[in-house]
């Protein structure tokens, strides 16, 4: 990570480059309730709370725990996933309608716990056994109980104790049935070489951090050994140390379906990242840096070989070297659970490493793949969100009126809101640019600093940050400069800062005594960059992927672009400016830009050779009518020159 320190007077200061420690102390995030959004992102969040979370019935989602006849499905994840967002959202919004629903769901879950501690819906012979999703469901049930504990511990200690005691009994059951000495240890249960089951490491670490009971850390250590030492297990450590790409960690049988080899496959994207999330939690307590290094290496491999221009990846939820295939029509791409888990992993790695690359990745995913997965009124989340075609609701899962991605979808907003600001020592980090008011505690000072931000980013480049502190405070203020933008202007209290700003992403750190009303104003240029794979091209503007949409009625959204002209326009990495413009259906689209481009292949006809005006919207807005008549595309074919075929 590159940082620039500006000390004392901002105009006369000497700016120096420093390198952050490889893995510095963990940054703190915004506490739930200490941030409020404004503008279009606030509207999207409000729609999710109002039209999705409030319309879920947690009693219905948890009723499956009382019908213990399952042998294969995963419906026991739904209540825990609901709580993964609903409980923190209540802390953020204090919505009076939400809390009673959360309480009712909690009571239903507690009432379903068996005497031996089990909460689930599997028949006894299939519990903690090979195949199925029983142990995976326990993971989400523990997470849900711990979220409930977190929102009750300050105001209702009795309920908080019931939540933590219920979670402890469930974890004790898991230790007995899948821990040391069990018939099937945890990596032998479930599917995908035990990855789904071993991802229980995250809630086990949460439970240890809240209780400090050694038996839970001991169980976490056992799960880590199962993840890393079992030859037939997930092998999340040695395969990373050997440099094996995430897509190449499985030995699969010959197959016509990606689901073949479901018991032994190690390439399941969602579950692999969930395991690394747990390993990072374990590193925070034990200091086992080899585990963190494996997580970082694997995440960087995901960036290099899997993540597409929309910030997500996977086909049929499996890694497949997808970055180089993203222009091709692979089936079932970009599952929303994969998208959200990637966001959570980036959020965690940002707080641990301080490396701005994780914020860059998170931002790209949030503004593209994540927002694209959401119905524009927030009521639904898609299961898959392709890079071209149309958008639609996913199928129902497990004989219930929901699915895994609908249950998981709202969680992405929580990661975004919590990590707008982070702090460590005497430093505040501004990671994301969204109109908002937020405060965060500065550990060294023991006080909170409040900020107000106004911006239309990423549609427009200006970001205005006001310091809403109550008294002068001396601390470092580090502002992220995204790698995908250029800084046109950087001002502090009206005075220009002209040096020390990283060109390829990083943080600018301003160290001084801040006064109430101080202002940092930055104007980013948002260059349009062309991306090419084989004979297909796509365009990004800043962090936003651009798409043609049928609502523009400006021709075939998949029209060929003339290769010779395009190559001249973007020669040697040149970027362009696609100006923002108004559109009659502006409420449907967050951003519309246009450009004169060489569309069509009839270069022998002067009129057809002329460049045409082409409109683009942000990928997240493309196809958001969720109608078969509203189609879109982000990758465009180039015309071919037969000369390249000649020897």
Identify the residue ranges that each predicted region occupies.
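Solvent-exposed beta-strand/loop surfaces of large extracellular or lumenal domains
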Residues: 485-512, 530-534
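Helix-terminus loop motifs that line ligand-binding clefts
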Residues: 82, 96-135, 306-315
